[in-house]
């Protein structure tokens, strides 16, 4: 990947994504703490969010060579983690008595938070690839 000149939109956006991952990661931590980390899979997004935030800052500074590809892979892992979390949360809501009722959607695992996590990973990856060709 080529070096970036100046501070184009994609670089500034990567910094915004890094901050967003810290905020969303904090919210994920609080929800999983409320659920007492019952499943080992709950540790994934909690540990991954700060790592992705660091990758976002590194990606905003440079995307040359292996660094750019590593940042891209880390954001892709965030996307996959978000998709897995969305499936797990929807399965958790469906398993509750009453299934997909408004009460279960509000009291159970948040159905949209993992999707937001994955969407941030996707937009971060797109920002890394911005003008790379």
What residue ranges belong to the model's regions?
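Membrane-helix boundary connector in multi-pass membrane proteins
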Residues: 60-69, 87-108
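Alpha-helical transmembrane segments of polytopic membrane proteins
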Residues: 41-50, 72-75, 105-118
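Juxtamembrane "helix-exit" motif on the non-cytosolic side of transmembrane helices
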Residues: 28-34, 59-62, 129-133
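Helical transmembrane-bundle signal
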Residues: 17-28, 49-59, 75-89, 121-125
